[in-house]
Amino acid sequence: MNALLIALPLLIGSCSDDNNSYNDPATVPTDIIQTVVKTTDNISIGVSTDKAAYKPGETVRFTVTDGTLPSSAHVRYRHGADVIADENIGSTSWTWTAPQADYTGYMADIYTTDANNQQTIYATIGVDVSSDWARFPRYGFIASYGNDRTSDVIASELSMLNRCHINGLQFYDWQYKQHWPLGGTPDNLLESYKDIANRDNYTSVVKDYIAQAHSFGMKAMFYNLCFGVFDDAKADGVGDHWYIYTDQNHSKCDRHQLPSDWKSDIYLVNPSNKDWQNYLADRNDDVYKALDFDGFHIDQLGDRGTDYDYYGSQVNLPNGYASFIRAMKERQPDKRLVMNAVSNYGSDKIVS
């Protein structure tokens, strides 16, 4: 607004019929005159960085992945219009030390300059310098962990996501059961297990995805509901009184129905129930002991209508989400939490 208020009188003055003044080029200070460089594009080179994001002062490695790099090519690093550095490339792989400014983005231009001072741009790529991925999250997901996911396949997939600067990954439907996410125990991991859709998941594949994600500077977040259990949950220690119901007489448990050939429907428990919170936090502790996940991607199912606890009291799910998030953070304060606000349901409590 200030810029507009200041500019308006200048515009009015310059358009006045009584104003015949003009700027004599000879009176313009030479230190503010910049040479205009004509630029054309010939985007014919593929270039990548070795990570999706970098800490301040970290080494950034660039690699030409496709096309032929001209022998006279330069790389220009800039923040907006401000050029940070400009240097001859000289090879198809080179490094640059990220500046110390945190939470700052840069653009690298690969270009040449001809005898007429005309520049041709062959490639551009961004560089995110941020010490915490949560400042500028760019979230992707993984959803298949079969034995067809070899290390080479995983590397190819994550290389593509890295080129898109994805810095966080949700591991969707990786778990053994909703209420028992780890396949086995930390001391006795299952080599393979059926996921919710009765597909084969391999623990080695999950581990490989995590390790390769970390090599690209990405965070690995395991997915699970905050209040879901399978039909065999009671045999695994889930309490009778933890469930939520669609009636006040605890005769009909609220459940999310799934195809009949899947492992189980999902039955809902009260996310604010302290016993349930402790139970799932224990299961999550096992996950963190066995697998190098960076945090928990928490899911919900949107508005469930009116639900009741075992004792007939109406359940406030958004308040339960807030309570659940606090409990998970208290148990694992160094792990990150993300929660999905399905159709924006409960979002005010999720972020509180």
List PLM regions with ranges.
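An acidic-aromatic substrate-binding cleft motif
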Residues: Y122-K177
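Active-site neighborhood of glycoside hydrolase catalytic domains
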Residues: P271-V351
